[in-house]
Amino acid sequence: MHILKLFFFFVVVLTSLNVLAESRLQKILETGKIRVGTTGDWNPMTMKDPSTNEYKGFEIEIVEQLAEDMGVNLVIIPTEWKTLVNGIVSNKYDISTSASLSAKRALSTGYTDSYFKLATVPLTLKNNLSKFQSWEDINKEGVKVAVTLGTTQEQQAKQIFPKATLNIIESPARDFQEVLAGRADAHITSNI
């Protein structure tokens, strides 16, 4: 009985997401524009040039090509990591760049197939390398770990490092800056 309930739950969720996706696509085609949320702070994927206020990067090239292929105009909407996925749910924009897949996020938004795989990595100063030879070395009382608010790395750090002190950093500040300033021993990021 429990499996049957779960099956129906997933059918309803997936059907609802499919209907929403179809209506969103219809709206994009009717309005002639696709709104894309991006942070503009993840080099080389999405970067905002402060001198021109234009966005560049690998993911920007992808959404430019998508808009061209669809025959619609591209509208870039600045966002932050903490609201990246919520912007889709709240209809602030139609799609986003750089949103890592997680089970929680998949309950409210649809995802395409990944075009590359990320790994989560810890980064620290060279003089700390002998202290941090493994993930377990980071998961200790007294160790300070910086992560960016709203990222999958934030969620991972909460699970992997329950004994460490987490410094959750809100953009536009960067978690690696906490390490450079001596306010954190390591930061958790992707391998990009």
Specify the residue positions occupied by each region the protein language model found.
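Short beta-strand-to-loop elements that line the ligand-binding cleft
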Residues: N73-E80, V147-T148, A164-P172
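Extracytoplasmic small-molecule ligand-binding "clamshell" domains
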Residues: E22-A99, L107
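Flexible hinge/capping segments at coil-to-helix
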Residues: K126-V143
